[in-house]
Amino acid sequence: MLKREMNIADYDPELWNAMEGEVTRQEEHIELIASENYTSPRVMQAQGSQLTNKYAEGYPGKRYYGGCEYVDVVEQLAIDRAKALFGADYANVQPHSGSQANAAVYMALLKPGDTVLGMNLAQGGHLTHGSPVNFSGKLYNIVPYGIDEAGKIDYQDIAEQAKKHKPKMIIGGFSAYSGLVDWAKMREIADSVGAYLFVDMAHVAGMIAAGVYPNPVPHAHVVTTTTHKTLAGPRGGLILAKGGDEEFYKKLNSAVFPGSQGGPLMHVIAGKAVALKEAMEPEFKVYQQQVAKNAKAMVDVFLARGYKVVSGGTENHLFLLDLVDKDITGKDADAALGRANITVNKNSVPNDPRSPFVTSGIRIGSPAITRRGFKEAEAKDLAGWMCDVLDNINDEANIEKVKQKVLDICAKFPVYA
């Protein structure tokens, strides 16, 4: 018999201790991984709801199971809010992740072996944009494009590659690029060779929703995103489009269900719905503006302290520190900062001499610290402490001093007040 008072702590203390340990880690560590954020208690309430019990294969009004009258309302709310927030006229809220959303787009629009132009993973792209170890690189003929010597997307290179290889699809979007993308220019290049323009805006979706970063939806044939990262919702994916016909949208829907997924996760879709509503609030815009300000403030400190930032700055929520000149590996920098309770991720930099398992850089993002309430002053202090650690990654006494400062500021700015 199920009872509402059942809990994990009493039944499975081994698991509960690990879960509580993660709560403490999040409260006592500064989170700078660009793809991570703190979701709201409302989203977590949705994800822990009885919606998790409901199977709902199909789409609202066209289900393969009975008893879907309430989950239809939930999914339709998420669809309508996604369309309103991003100016789309099509939305699919069922993908379990950004990678699943991307896989569905490939499946809908391409045949195995088709040529695709995607951003090189080593220069800022994503695994699903054609990395040889990913399904995208295994199933399709990938032609990578990259950045120029100034660290900016090389549109001339994209245009030349497109003209030469005649791709069926060009992918815009990134996982480690700190500049703005000219979506109109990307569409112009795609149109010149009759290719689809597919944009993966996962990293900057929250900034786009708030009008802080250019919106690709009016320019692309199809757009995907995650619902976490800057959007600060549950872990999941979305597919959006504007200006397509019903046949095009039917292809996209079919590629999600039944093409690549079965039943949707209705508890997660409820979390997406509430996160999309939160993203429509005026304070969400203020939050995203602060995300950009904090990233810029941190870049200023790193540059002043003699550190190299790829492309020399940032126009979004993230930036890459290039540590080649400092002769520090990304792996060692990541570990040293971790000992000071500062969490980053090692990341390859353009023309990186080291392997992807070691790297010569770290990726830094401001969404999570901004969610805690950090403003420019705190962001600058934090960047200074990071420089103190990186100036001598073997000075354990100094790392311990920085750790104490981190613990103090974390107590002052709790994740969940």
From Swiss-Prot:
The keyword Amino-acid biosynthesis applies. The modification N6-(pyridoxal phosphate)lysine is found at residue 229. Catalyzes the reversible interconversion of serine and glycine with tetrahydrofolate (THF) serving as the one-carbon carrier. This reaction serves as the major source of one-carbon groups required for the biosynthesis of purines, thymidylate, methionine, and other important biomolecules. Also exhibits THF-independent aldolase activity toward beta-hydroxyamino acids, producing glycine and aldehydes, via a retro-aldol mechanism. It is found in: Cytoplasm. InterPro entries: PyrdxlP-dep_Trfase, PyrdxlP-dep_Trfase_major, PyrdxlP-dep_Trfase_small, Ser_HO-MeTrfase, Ser_HO-MeTrfase-like, Ser_HO-MeTrfase_PLP_BS, SHMT-like_dom. Its EC number is 2.1.2.1. Pfam families: SHMT. Its cofactor is pyridoxal 5'-phosphate. (6S)-5,6,7,8-tetrahydrofolate binds at residues 121, 125-127, 355-357. Belongs to the SHMT family. Keywords: Amino-acid biosynthesis, Cytoplasm, One-carbon metabolism, Pyridoxal phosphate, Transferase. HAMAP family: SHMT. GO terms for molecular function: glycine hydroxymethyltransferase activity; pyridoxal phosphate binding. The gene is glyA. GO terms for cellular component: cytosol. This is Serine hydroxymethyltransferase. GO terms for biological process: glycine biosynthetic process from serine; tetrahydrofolate interconversion. Pathway: One-carbon metabolism; tetrahydrofolate interconversion; Amino-acid biosynthesis; glycine biosynthesis; glycine from L-serine: step 1/1. The record marks 228 as: Plays an important role in substrate specificity.
